[in-house]
UniProtKB/Swiss-Prot annotation:
Source organism of this protein record: Pseudomonas putida (strain ATCC 47054 / DSM 6125 / CFBP 8728 / NCIMB 11950 / KT2440)
Gene3D superfamilies (UniProt xref): Winged helix-like DNA-binding domain superfamily/Winged helix DNA-binding domain
Database matches in CDD domains: HTH_ARSR (cd00090)
Residue ranges of the TM segments: none
Protein name, as recorded: Arsenic resistance transcriptional regulator ArsR2
Length: 115
């Protein structure tokens, strides 16, 4: 079971916090979408996602050569609630990331090829 210190430690890095909130907002994102939204390299994004996955915050699924990430549905309800409150109270903090993602060329359609 994930504890409050585990959650807050996971979200203490800005890249992990932004990625987690974007995933919480949109349901599921692949590495290439997060690269675009966060304007970061694939190795950096993948490293942070691996950390979030290893501590139980995220689950992944492979579709061909692409990996998609989503919140772990077995997280305690307080984690989901905290993420939703954070999203609602801080939409401006993620506005640039959301805009980059919205304007992404070749954005993947689920169940098809990414990027």
């Amino acid at each position: 079971m994930i504890t409050p210190p585990d959650v807050f430690k996971s979200l203490s890095d800005e890249t992990r916090a932004r990625a987690t909130l974007l995933i919480a907002s949109l349901g599921e994102l692949c590495v290439c979408e997060l690269m675009c939204a966060l304007n970061d390299s694939q190795p950096k994004i993948s490293r942070h996602l691996a950390q979030l996955r290893s501590n139980g915050m995220l689950l992944d699924r492979r579709q061909g050569q692409w990996v998609y990430y989503r919140l772990n549905p077995e997280l305690p309800s307080w984690v989901h609630e905290m993420l939703q409150v954070t999203l609602q109270a801080n939409s401006q903090w993620l506005a640039d990331n959301a805009l980059r993602l919205k304007n992404m060329d070749g954005r993947p359609v689920r169940d098809s090829v990414c990027c």
